[in-house]
């Protein structure tokens, strides 16, 4: 299963994706069977996930390169070639021809939009539909808004999460999130693993840990 985390810029996609990767690794750590799993950056200009997951290494967060059709096709080919059972990819934030190209291999998408740009979720839904990509989850991220994180519809994986700054993630990883958001990310990780292990739509996870 190839799943992309996408949505408008400044929505907390990088920290969310890095936290989701950590949660999947944690879920698998003590299991006798390890589901083949990897992650793949799709944005040629941004290497944030690698920088967040490897804070002690000398990883450049930004790359001084331009998006071109050729580079997008190269990224799509690399994404398509990944043969692990579960591949998590982070997408660029702007809907462009290049974005549509790199999304082509995806089976599903998690759409994440900040509170001020919730209306742009519809645009991402349309991109997903045009590429025959299932919407696995839709999340609104908040930073300073006076709203509480939590599920609106658990079975559809729709809800609100609290965003964090990259510096907070660098210091504490996924534990930098509030308890509710941290639990929601772990539940999404569990759903993805269940989906890949059973090859059918997972039942909602009711666990709180």
Segment roles from a protein language model:
Residues 3-26:
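Glycine-rich phosphate-binding P-loop
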Residues 30-33, 77-84, 101-105:
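Flexible, charged surface loops at secondary-structure boundaries
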Residues 27-48:
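Short beta-strand-centered segment that lines the nucleotide-binding/catalytic pocket of NTP-utilizing
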Residues 2-4, 36, 84-88:
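Residue-level preference for the first positions of well-ordered beta-strands
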Residues 50-67:
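Conserved NTP-binding/hydrolysis module of P-loop NTPases
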Residues 93-177:
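Conserved catalytic-core segment of NTP-binding enzymes
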Residues 63, 81-96:
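Switch II (G3) loop of P-loop NTPases
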Residues 157-208:
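NTP-dependent small-molecule kinase module
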């Amino acid at each position: 299963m190839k799943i992309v985390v996408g949505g408008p810029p400044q929505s907390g996609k990088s920290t969310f994706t890095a936290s989701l990767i950590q949660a999947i690794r944690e879920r698998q750590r003590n299991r006798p069977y390890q589901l083949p799993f990897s992650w793949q950056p799709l944005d040629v200009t941004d290497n944030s996930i690698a920088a967040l997951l490897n804070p002690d290494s000398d990883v450049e967060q930004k790359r001084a390169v331009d998006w071109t059709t050729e580079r997008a096709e190269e990224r799509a080919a690399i994404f398509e070639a990944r043969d692990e059972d579960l591949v998590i990819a982070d997408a660029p934030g702007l809907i462009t021809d290049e974005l549509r190209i790199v999304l082509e291999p995806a089976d599903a998408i998690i759409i994440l939009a900040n509170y001020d740009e919730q209306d742009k979720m519809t645009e991402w839904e349309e991109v997903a539909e045009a590429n025959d990509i299932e919407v696995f989850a839709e999340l609104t991220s908040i930073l300073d808004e006076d709203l509480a994180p939590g599920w609106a519809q658990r079975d559809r994986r729709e809800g609100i999460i609290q965003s964090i700054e990259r510096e907070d993630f660098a210091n504490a990883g996924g534990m930098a999130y509030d308890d509710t958001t941290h639990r929601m990310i772990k539940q999404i990780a569990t759903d993805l693993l269940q989906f890949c292990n059973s090859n059918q739509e997972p039942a909602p996870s009711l666990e709180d840990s």
